[in-house]
């Protein structure tokens, strides 16, 4: 029986109380704004001005394609990939993104052989990363989770009993991993909207999204406290819609919707910041490149290009031109910077002065990684 299994058994033996979110007055962490890419000097200047920093994200396909079939992380391959990065670390925040089949296996819960395999591997991998790179704060993407739909109902319309049961299920599934993370990065991407209206959600959808976002952050804050690891909760967010709901994939989210459905509930629920992800450079490369000969255009990307063409009243060919590519990059850059600026504005209004974050281990903070970033800013 492994330490992870013993840990899980201990938490399964009656911990069912859901504690309230921390009060604003008890806030101890500085606000955190981290992002995947800036895409323009102007956006970079704006991000730096609000304290933004890039984070490192390691996707499983970067170094461990076999993990999709084994459900285990090749830790030596992961360590080599991170250690041999020519550009070093962009900051002291890092994310491991292992989703397939890890999400499904963890969803099976304690008692499942798949759950044990995936959980043991994820715990061992993050422990290894923390020992090799002690100046970096490590986490996993999407941990912990909370389902938007419960038994066919949205979070907002589900019963209190159903919500409580869902929260406890997720705690049981993720407790061993949460105990090892230096910060928690649940995903609160917006996926719900109306394709016929360019992805913009209606009033009801906005209220439902807001309620779910707040619950995700509150539960993550609570889970960290329950495992004795009250680390910052810095959720993954995006200025564009993500797949999984009715919204048009990769369409830009209106600023007012971001404010109401994402930023404010994060701050109000006790979140410590935002981890902004767009993959903008990849998306721009997809929507601006002609499809390969004999291959149909991407089913999700092409409608976004068409929508932009209609909104800007320019031909698709213009968007694919050098000037069009530059303009699309600027739009993603501005969306990232705007998200960061809005978050800091809401934080300042809600939280007031901040108190510096304590070292994660209770000891003097370790030095930053020795590998300085060598790449020029975008």
What are the roles of these predicted feature ranges?
Residues 144-185, 245-246, 250-254:
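Substrate-binding cleft/loops of secretory-pathway carbohydrate-active enzymes
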Residues 98-103, 160, 166-210, 277-279:
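Aromatic- and acid-rich polysaccharide-binding/catalytic face
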Residues 234-360:
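Substrate-binding cleft of secreted/luminal carbohydrate-active enzymes
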Residues 40-45, 77-83, 162-175, 213-224, ...:
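Alpha-helical scaffolding within the catalytic cores
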Residues 142-152, 220-256:
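Active-site clefts of carbohydrate-active enzymes
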Residues 29-33, 54-58, 91-95, 135-139, ...:
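Structural preference for beta-strand elements that scaffold enzyme active sites
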Residues 84-115, 144, 180-192, 272-279:
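Active-site groove signature of glycoside hydrolases
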Residues 16-70:
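Boundary/entry segment of secreted carbohydrate-active catalytic domains
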